[in-house]
């Protein structure tokens, strides 16, 4: 994930996750590793990271989720000692977010966009946290069968709404944080499990979903809470399951999907 630096005040930083969170600096003549963020330096073993998110309002904040039930919020610092930009990081907070593995984390634009984030995990719940009040969290949704929730995505224009998907589920669940535990919509047209969710960057009522049925579907959800029967646009990848999807942040006419060994750019 590239640093969300719309004003161009930071170096060209790229973060990757796996065993640890790594921050790289892209530039000429090469790309180099700036720092490895490890919160457990006393052990030779690590709990793998499952996901991370870069705060769009404050790019100094990065949140990670892990199979060890925790979420960690990292603070990044950049400086220029001896005419060379350096990047370092420290743990701002680490919390036990779920009863089981945490599979995804995402910052919300609510409340100024800096302090609110949500996570999903193997316990089947969506939980929302506020960095200013970490002594408690809010359970937004719990899967009735306690099926693991794999992904979540916040609405880019209306932070009251988020979407999530359960493991091996053909259905995307739309939630309203003002009405906890009750889905306001279910998007059910996929014929195989859903792998990716992406809200439109320019519209509060459009969302794209992608799955193992080779399909990428765009939905209009403005009629909620009435049932949403069908997507407004559909694309079928001929050669494989769609594994991930991204909606262009600065050029919302474009959506990227990946399947097999291919990446395709679709015009909406």
Per-range role (PLM):
Residues 1-52, 58-62:
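Eukaryotic helix-linker segments that join adjacent hydrophobic helices
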Residues 16-19, 64-68, 75-76, 120-123, ...:
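Conserved strand-to-loop turn within each blade of WD40 beta-propeller repeats
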Residues 45-48, 58, 91, 101, ...:
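WD40/WD-repeat beta-propeller blade-loop signature
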Residues 165-168, 188-226:
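Loop/turn-rich, solvent-exposed surfaces of beta-rich toroidal or solenoidal domains
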Residues 243-268:
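Blade-level signature of beta-propeller repeat domains, shared across WD40, Kelch, NHL, RCC1
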């Amino acid at each position: 994930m590239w640093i969300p630096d719309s004003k161009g005040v930071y170096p060209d930083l790229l973060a990757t996750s796996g065993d640890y969170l790594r921050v790289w600096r892209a530039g000429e003549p090469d790309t180099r590793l700036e720092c490895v963020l490890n919160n457990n330096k006393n052990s030779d073993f690590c709990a793998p990271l499952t996901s991370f998110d870069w705060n769009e309002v404050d790019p100094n904040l990065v949140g990670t989720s892990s199979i060890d039930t925790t979420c960690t919020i990292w603070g990044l610092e950049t400086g220029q000692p001896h005419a060379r930009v350096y990047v370092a990081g420290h743990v701002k907070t680490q919390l036990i977010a779920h009863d089981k593995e945490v599979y995804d984390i995402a910052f919300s634009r609510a409340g100024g966009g800096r302090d609110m984030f949500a996570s999903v995990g193997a316990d089947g719940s969506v939980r929302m946290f506020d960095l200013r009040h970490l002594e408690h969290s809010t359970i937004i949704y719990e899967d009735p069968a306690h099926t693991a929730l794999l992904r979540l995505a916040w609405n880019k224009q209306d932070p009251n709404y988020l979407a999530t998907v359960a493991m091996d589920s053909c259905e995307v669940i739309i939630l309203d944080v003002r009405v906890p535990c009750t889905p306001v919509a279910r998007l059910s047209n996929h014929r195989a499990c859903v792998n990716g969710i992406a809200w439109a960057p320019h519209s509060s009522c459009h969302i794209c979903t992608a799955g193992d049925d080779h399909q990428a579907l765009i939905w209009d959800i403005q009629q909620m809470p009435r049932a949403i029967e069908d997507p407004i646009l559909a694309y079928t990848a001929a050669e494989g399951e769609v594994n991930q999807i991204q909606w262009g942040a600065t050029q919302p006419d474009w959506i990227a999907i990946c399947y097999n060994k291919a990446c395709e750019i679709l015009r909406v």
